[in-house]
Amino acid sequence: MSMSGSDFGAPCDDPKIFRNICRDRILKDLLQPDKDKETKSSWKVLIMDKFTVRIMAYACKMAEITDAGISLVEDLFKRREPMPSMDAIYFLQPLKENVIMLLSDMSGRCPLYRKAYIFFSSPIPKELVSYIKNDSSVIPRIGALREMNLEFFAIDMQGFTTDHDMAFTDLYSAQHNSKKFNDTISTMATRIATTFASLKEFPCVRYRAPKGTDPMTTPKFDMVPKWLATAVWDIVSKYKSTIPEFPQKETCELLIVDRPIDQIAPVIHEWTYDAMCHDLLEMDGQKYIYEVSKAGSEPERKEALLEDHDPLWVELRHIHIADASERLYDKMNNFVSKNKAAQLHSRDGGEISTKDLQKIVQALPQYGEQVEKLTLHIEIAGKINKFIREYGLRDIGQVEQDLVFGDAAAKEVISILRSKQDMSPENKLRLLIIYAIVYPEKFEGDKGEKLMQLAKLPHDEMDAINSLRYLVGSDTKKASRPGGFSLKFDAQKKKNAARTERQDGDETWALSRFFPLIEELIEKLSKGALPLNEYPSMSEPSSTEQGSTQSAAATKPAQAQPMSRRSRRTPTWAKSRNSDDSQSSDSSVLRHGSNDFKRLGNRIFVFMIGGATRSELRTVHKLTMKLKREIVLGSSSIDDPPQFISKLKMLTAGGANDV
């Protein structure tokens, strides 16, 4: 029996994609520092600290590390056996405690390894270089001492984080710690800059301008994008003289924004497969834990990584859960129809179950891995659809999106709170947060408390609403800038819409109208239509920069977004299989599109301070196909709704909500 690639998803691997460039730097520049002199027997030991091991884990597979000549991976701070006949590669953060351990390994009469190739993840301070040079016994044993400038987590083919999970609270809290504030800005800027050092890209840096014009009255947190942009610009500008072959003119664009510009995206129910996995299932990062039934014994607990090395995941992650479910059903039926052994294990030709598929795995070991993946995703999709029904998410999602597009107001919110008595407290709060963003006047005075009582939510849940007010402030002039913050507390009372209907939206599936604000920003940036007064540049864009019409665009007055027109609701949950779906899969662009990026346009980087969302990660993949430019999303972290809401509450917990 022959199997087509489409049955299980097609693998995608293109060296020009962002994360693959990071992987290649590690495999070639770091793990094979002396490759011209090496033989097949030149095995080395790789030693890392707790941070760099995570950089490595996101960028490479263990098999790739082994293929690069690494026989053993060790923890810097764990006791290690001496291997004086082998060379060691150290990949470390430039911290004093790391350097002390390194010198302890390599100094004295009996070093642990023959020679040390030392790579630091970011620029090493001069005092640490001097500290190394002062140990005369170590110097002859150093084969290389380099700065890799690779201090970020490549969490996605087109996404990275700087590992600042608490940046939202550290930078935006009403009771922030000044030292922690400054340290966070500094380390975040350094790690962002290393992405450009790794890719040898010199960015034109733009940022969300402060709402206030008076530095004396502008809240400190409102200056965060500007301060971060300044710090990044200072670092990358120095690369022109410190990194060989680093560009002298801008080769790409970096837009720095922050979470307050779009607080709907982190709380609204997103209906794509990836987002629903992280919203509804118990996930540990990209790790999904599940149980497999075993005949005559206890269920076996297993773990699965939902990431780019799983071709089915790549195909399904950014499409609607209903579409993903249909595709999985079709793949399963297609597999069974092509295989007689599989037909024997199905139930009288009826609908095949996951248990049937497990029997097929045993009967057809040659297809074990593929069928196991298919079984896994069928189980995941089944769980998600079960939760959608049990939690009544279709009705909740409809009200959420109608609020966002101006098609619902108090009547619909009150109605669903009264009719759905079994709605979870978390979903009630998410709905009320969206309501507060679109209709802030409904939470003035004691109105918010009354809504909380109607929803039967505890008083302390108001911390989330108070934080929204705190982030926007009470100055109407501050909150009314076109294209800026969508939340307008104390603004004129009128029917609001937080989004304007898009002509290119996918109406095939219900609940597909919502899009993150960065989608509009990226499109405007790509066209050179992003106003410079709202998103200033750290420098005048060079003539070689893609979208050189920005200067002209800056002279045009910014147009306020029109109010949303009432749109036709998508009446059905399902679509016909032959209808077009513009978000069907990103695998084709990953396989074939990168040559087009190089030919048609420079990269665009967007950095979201305070945590990005799954929908924003999906957006950069979608726009990469649409704009024919590789879009890379960076952030301090990737947050799912519960994480964001917890952080939101912390901003003003205890009533510290003075602006």
Swiss-Prot record:
InterPro entries: Sec-1-like_dom1 (IPR043154), Sec-1-like_dom3a (IPR043127), Sec1-like (IPR001619), Sec1-like_dom2 (IPR027482), Sec1-like_sf (IPR036045). The keyword Transport applies. Residues 539-553 have a biased composition (Polar residues). This is Probable protein transport Sec1b. It comes from Oryza sativa subsp. japonica. SUPFAM superfamilies: Sec1/munc18-like (SM) proteins. The lineage of its organism: Eukaryota, Viridiplantae, Streptophyta, Embryophyta, Tracheophyta. GO terms for biological process: intracellular protein transport; vesicle docking involved in exocytosis; vesicle-mediated transport. GO terms for molecular function: syntaxin binding.
